[in-house]
């Protein structure tokens, strides 16, 4: 095999590959052996027709498709390795010359991984932010727990006030015509929750059980349904009943009811620790994002469009998997959100470009700094994944993953170790 490299454009090269006549003839024989059971020639049993007779009867060209595939499957990776080329995607192959007893000559045009010119990446002036837990955050959490554990009682006297729950029947009209999805019965609406359109709930304050009222509102411009966006609407509303929330006392008994602790003081302390942990995780994410942004901005690279598209493909597959877990198809999700595949891919493009750039820069730094994944790290990560994908026998699944997904797991660990290296080397 001989290969000649021609640069077509940035990150695109054309390989001219020559496969020796002897090797192509061997590929022709391999093609014959693969297909000999398909040929029917009078006087020969099926599968026993000699190659020479098949060539005479059908022509040697009958073997070309498979023979070319066999020859390319062997010679293309060999050429990539010889020329130290790392392709991004499958090549565009064009046959230049072929024939029995002749060289197979073909070209393979392929997009390659871009070269990354690293800038400053050590000693970055970036610090991890610090977020203190405020008392108001703890109070908010406790208030939410109190609301969730409230008793709902029928309000026997008085009219609707803010914070009450109005049980209503309603029907909406636009220009005097009822619209789809604008009707409900025995709907429990907490006044002041902001559940309905702006100014809807406020117009119910002061009403009593049995009252009927025409409520006039305007749908937001970006409501999400074209036929309703920005439209004025009138709702016929009837008050069926009024309910109130009876909030539990914030004491030790409350703490026992909503958690595994015995005192209200312990409950507050646990909430504080949880918020501190959340704040630290948030700070760590922001720190990492700032470091990645800096090393990307300090580096130079031209990323091929195909790499971005492949990353978008992966993001779409991930979304589809998460939706499936929730019992939704991608088509249903797009219908609910008014999206199309093109809109979603456009929306994902910026994040996909950043992900590609981040991976390329981190890989380049890892190569420069000789950052590796140890066998211990690899096995530990495989075991973590084994517990997720093979909970009945995680150790067996871990061994399978080490064999089948080694490169992917190793890459993830190297990128994580590289990011850790960058953070440790910040000022």
From Swiss-Prot:
One of its GO terms (cellular component) is cytoplasm. InterPro entries: PPIase_dom_sf, PPIase_FKBP_dom, Trig_fac, Trigger_fac_C, Trigger_fac_C_sf, Trigger_fac_ribosome-bd_bac, Trigger_fac_ribosome-bd_sf, Trigger_fact/SurA_dom_sf. Keywords: Cell cycle, Cell division, Chaperone, Cytoplasm, Isomerase, Rotamase. The keyword Cell division applies. GO terms for molecular function: peptidyl-prolyl cis-trans isomerase activity; protein folding chaperone; ribosome binding. The keyword Cell division applies. Residues 163-248 form the PPIase FKBP-type domain. It catalyses: [protein]-peptidylproline (omega=180) = [protein]-peptidylproline (omega=0). Its EC number is 5.2.1.8. Belongs to the FKBP-type PPIase family. Tig subfamily. Involved in protein export. Acts as a chaperone by maintaining the newly synthesized protein in an open conformation. Functions as a peptidyl-prolyl cis-trans isomerase. HAMAP family: Trigger_factor_Tig. This is Trigger factor.
